[in-house]
């Protein structure tokens, strides 16, 4: 390559680039606001050429200048953005044509030249790294008609000529695949904090809440919207949502996993899997560390779930009990100013508000039970809806074990038996709760046994209600059975550690499991009573509690039936009363009692005859007088059902256990105005 005149004949090889259609560079005027001259030729060189030292060219290629200089110089090509000059002559700013990118066809044999072009530099923007560290090789071939560019953001200009070229930014911004959003407020997450992806604000809020006092009170209905703009409006709902999405105190990450760390590790320090995707090691609150794909779909997570299932199967009973004990929710406070003496409305409102708070923590507790989240979503929902009141009552009994004669609903809400007299129909439920608590006190129930019974109630609540129909349902049912076996093994292990004989261990296991049927019976009573209070508008039920209550009442087992119960006919047959005993003022009273059936067992011996005379298989459900009563456990006085029927009287057919005279009397009762 020939050197320029006046220079050493053996300097570094130079590449001559000549401007197209322009005058001498020294004659160009500078417009105000423009950058200074991009490149000034050194002294002794022709001003028509621009020389580039050889380190910017491929040293392995020998360029022959006999074909003429390469017309490649242009501020736009070198990614220098400048504003258009409208008042300058057109000769000063020539339009960029395709000929500026490759030579004419007069040189078909020109060899290819490889240039190392760095990424385009945008002025007034900080460069994340030196451009020469990530240089890319681009080939310029004279025989091809492809457009040459230094990066993908370089756009071809049209042949008619456009004043300036738009160049996109080439900064190393984070891609969409690396973005995570806060599970609480849906803002951009800064990392994996307390078991979930969360932003710095929600992380700091949750940290303050678990370290200090979290006695937040929602001014509305505990259903405030928590998003990026309204996350500071209600601290109570924000903390509730933190627990709902799975934030937990033990879920501290073992290694920082933020965008910056993931991006830096992607450069070579980050481990990679065989598919080429980067892996990030995240601590999930357990001793075993797991690998999570940042960009992988859901299907590659199957080995992780399989390993998790194996880990559950190999878990010892001691470790299983430790896990479910750690999952126990904290103490929940009512945080209300209790005004005594209670009224029916105030006590029911306090009970429902506390139950609504406990339901939120119950869902989080269930998800922390090992293996529960592996069940199908339908099974998880059904299990919770079938046993929510049983779990609440078991927790109430456990808190009340050390307080004879009292029910400890929360540390700031304790009731004696006599205080329940203000609520109609709740005294029997209180007595049953106190009886169960007394039985736990006699057995000296241990905390390990309590958590096992609580998990057993959850997993056994909906086991025999339906049969699996699909392969997914069958698989979920098998997982549920294996999980229930783990709970039973844990309970047996907990009893064996008490130093009892084999016979005593067997008896204790039987006594504890028999109490579960008592808890379910109390739960059914409480469900009926709460439904009654809701129908009478004594208390307003809303939010999660309303959904749980509707799920139980709509199942057909807890709705009171309008048909007369078996005790009605038995009482009438044993104690006949003339219709004249009804006085005009008793209509309203009896109607009210029809809405709230008096609770209490009956000693009527005719009930056995009714069950024998009307088997379930021989009568349709709508004609049976026993099945609705057995479903609802309602006890209706014989004088009440006829006045509460309203428009139509129930149809009564003569049977072998009801005399004709009694049917005539009942007809008179119904038709009496």
UniProtKB/Swiss-Prot annotation:
The keyword Cell membrane does not apply. Residues 1-181 are annotated as: Modulating. Residues 554-566 have a biased composition (Low complexity). Keywords: DNA-binding, Lipid-binding, Metal-binding, Nucleus, Receptor, Steroid-binding, Transcription, Transcription regulation, Zinc, Zinc-finger. InterPro entries: ER-beta-like_N, ER-beta/gamma, Est_rcpt/est-rel_rcp, NHR-like_dom_sf, Nucl_hrmn_rcpt_lig-bd, Nuclear_hormone_rcpt_NR3, Nuclear_hrmn_rcpt, Znf_hrmn_rcpt. GO terms for biological process: cellular response to estradiol stimulus; estrogen receptor signaling pathway. Abundant in the liver and testes, less abundant in the ovary and barely detectable in the muscle. Residues 316-552 form the NR LBD domain. GO terms for cellular component: nucleus. A zinc finger (NR C4-type) spans 182-202, 218-242. Its main location: nucleus. It is found in: Nucleus. Residues 182-247 bind DNA. One of its GO terms (molecular function) is steroid binding. It comes from the Eukaryota. It holds the Pfam family ERbeta_N. Residues 553-602 are annotated as: Disordered. Composed of three domains: a modulating N-terminal domain, a DNA-binding domain and a C-terminal ligand-binding domain. Belongs to the nuclear hormone receptor family. NR3 subfamily. Binds DNA as a homodimer. Can form a heterodimer with ER-alpha. This is Estrogen receptor beta. It comes from Micropogonias undulatus.
């Amino acid at each position: 390559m020939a050197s320029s005149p006046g220079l050493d004949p053996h300097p570094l090889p130079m590449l001559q680039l000549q401007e197209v259609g322009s005058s001498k560079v020294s004659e160009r005027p500078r417009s105000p606001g423009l950058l200074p001259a991009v490149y000034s030729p050194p002294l002794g060189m022709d001003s028509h050429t621009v020389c580039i030292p050889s380190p910017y060219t491929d040293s392995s290629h020998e360029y022959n200048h006999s074909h003429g200089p390469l017309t490649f110089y242009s501020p736009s090509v070198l990614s220098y953005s400048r504003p258009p000059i409208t008042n300058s002559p057109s000769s000063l700013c020539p339009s960029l044509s395709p000929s500026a990118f490759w030579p004419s066809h007069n040189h078909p044999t020109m060899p290819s030249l490889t240039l190392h072009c760095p990424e385009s530099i945008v002025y007034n923007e900080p460069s994340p790294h030196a451009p020469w560290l990530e240089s890319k090789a681009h080939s310029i071939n004279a025989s091809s008609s492809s457009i040459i560019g230094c990066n993908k953001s370089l756009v071809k200009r049209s042949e008619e000529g456009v004043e300036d070229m738009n160049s996109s930014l080439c900064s190393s911004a984070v891609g969409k695949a690396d973005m995570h959003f806060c599970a609480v407020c849906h803002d951009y997450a800064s990392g994996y904090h307390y078991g979930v992806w969360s932003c710095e604000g929600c992380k700091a809020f949750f940290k303050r809440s678990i370290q200090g006092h979290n006695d937040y009170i929602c001014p509305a209905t505990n259903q405030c919207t928590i998003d990026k703009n309204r996350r500071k409006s209600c601290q109570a709902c924000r903390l509730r949502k933190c627990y709902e999405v799975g934030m937990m105190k033990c879920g501290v990450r073992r290694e920082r996993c933020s965008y910056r760390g993931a991006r830096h590790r992607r450069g070579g320090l980050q481990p990679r899997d065989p598919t080429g995707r980067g892996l990030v090691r995240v601590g999930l609150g357990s001793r075993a560390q797991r690998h999570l794909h940042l960009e992988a779909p859901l299907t590659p997570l199957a080995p992780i779930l399989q390993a998790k299932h194996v880990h559950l199967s190999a878990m010892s009973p001691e470790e299983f009990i430790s896990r479910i004990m750690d999952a126990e929710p904290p103490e929940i406070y009512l945080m209300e100013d209790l005004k005594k003496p209670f009224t029916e409305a105030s006590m029911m409102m306090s009970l429902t508000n506390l139950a609504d708070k406990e339901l939120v923590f119950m869902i989080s507790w269930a998800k922390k039970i090992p293996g529960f989240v592996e069940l199908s979503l339908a099974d998880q929902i059904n299990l919770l809806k079938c046993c929510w009141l049983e779990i609440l009552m078991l927790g109430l009994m456990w808190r009340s074990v050390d307080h004879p004669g009292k029910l400890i609903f929360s540390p700031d809400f304790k009731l004696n038996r006599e205080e329940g007299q203000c609520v109609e129909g709740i005294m029997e439920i209180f007595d049953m709760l106190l009886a169960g608590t007394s039985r736990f006190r006699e057995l000296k129930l241990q905390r390990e046994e309590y958590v096992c019974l609580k998990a057993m109630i959850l997993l056994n609540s909906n086991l025999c209600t339906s049969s699996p129909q699909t392969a997914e349902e069958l698989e979920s049912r098998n997982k549920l059975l294996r999980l229930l076996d783990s709970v039973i093994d844990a309970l047996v292990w907990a009893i064996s550690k008490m130093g009892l004989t084999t016979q005593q261990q067997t008896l204790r296991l039987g006594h504890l499991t028999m109490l579960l049927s008592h808890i379910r019976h109390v739960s059914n009573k409480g469900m009926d009573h709460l439904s009654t209070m809701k129908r009478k508008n004594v208390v307003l039920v809303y939010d999660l509690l309303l959904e749980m209550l509707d799920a139980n009442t709509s199942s057909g087992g807890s709705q009171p039936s309008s048909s007369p119960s078996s005790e009605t006919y038995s009482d009438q047959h044993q104690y006949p009363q003339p219709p004249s005993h009804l006085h005009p003022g008793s209509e309203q009273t009896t109607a009210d009692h029809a809405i709230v059936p008096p609770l209490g067992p009956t000693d009527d011996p005719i009930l056995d005859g009714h069950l024998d005379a009307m088997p379930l298989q021989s009568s349709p459900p709508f004609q049976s007088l026993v099945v609705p009563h057995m479903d609802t456990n309602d006890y209706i006085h014989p004088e009440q059902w006829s006045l509460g029927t309203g428009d139509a009287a129930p149809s009564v057919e003569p049977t072998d256990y009801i005399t004709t005279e009694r049917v005539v009397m009942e007809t008179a009762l119904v038709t009496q105005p």
